[in-house]
Curated annotation (Swiss-Prot):
Protein name: Large ribosomal subunit protein bL34
Family, similarity comment: Belongs to the bacterial ribosomal protein bL34 family.
GO molecular function: structural constituent of ribosome
Upper taxonomic lineage: Bacteria, Bacillati, Actinomycetota, Actinomycetes, Mycobacteriales
UniProt entry keywords in alphabetical sequence: Ribonucleoprotein, Ribosomal protein
Length: 47
């Protein structure tokens, strides 16, 4: 029985484009996410 391939293939550019700060600031909901993380005192706001 062969297992499937590993699903996490790290790629920094994709990580930034999908979860990055610029993307979060683009939408109202994204800005809310950053604001919540700021108020919570998260060390890293975005990827």
């Amino acid at each position: 029985m062969a297992k499937g391939k590993r699903t996490f293939q790290p790629n920094n550019r994709r990580r930034a484009r999908v979860h990055g700060f610029r993307l979060r600031m683009r939408t109202r909901a994204g800005r809310a996410i950053v604001a919540n993380r700021r108020s919570k005192g998260r060390r890293a706001l975005t990827a």
